[in-house]
Amino acid sequence: GKCGDINAPCTSACDCCGKSVECDCYWGKECSCRESFFGAATXL
């Protein structure tokens, strides 16, 4: 399965994020994570 667009939520095919990070998903197998605004409010 491929990721959705860059603004799409994480899916099982691109499940690199949790409550503290967001996925930047692309049309491929590459996926990068970054801190989300809401996740930053809660320390890891």
Curated annotation (Swiss-Prot):
Name recorded for this polypeptide: U9-ctenitoxin-Co1a
An annotated Gene Ontology molecular function: sodium channel regulator activity
Cystine connections: C3-C17, C10-C23, C16-C33, C25-C31
Keyword terms: Disulfide bond, Ion channel impairing toxin, Ionotropic glutamate receptor inhibitor, Knottin, Neurotoxin, Postsynaptic neurotoxin, Secreted, Toxin, Voltage-gated sodium channel impairing toxin
Family statement drawn from the similarity comment of this UniProt entry: Belongs to the neurotoxin 03 (Tx2) family. 05 subfamily.
Record's comment describing the protein's domains: The presence of a 'disulfide through disulfide knot' structurally defines this protein as a knottin.
Major location category of this protein: secreted
Gene Ontology CC entries for this record: extracellular region; host cell postsynaptic membrane
InterPro entries in UniProt: CNTX
Described purpose of this protein according to its UniProt entry: Insecticidal neurotoxin that reversibly inhibits the N-methyl-D-aspartate (NMDA)-subtype of ionotropic glutamate receptor (GRIN) and inhibits inactivation of insect sodium channels (Nav). In vivo, is highly toxic to insects.
One Pfam family of this chain: D_CNTX
Tissue expression notes: Expressed by the venom gland.
Localization annotation: Secreted
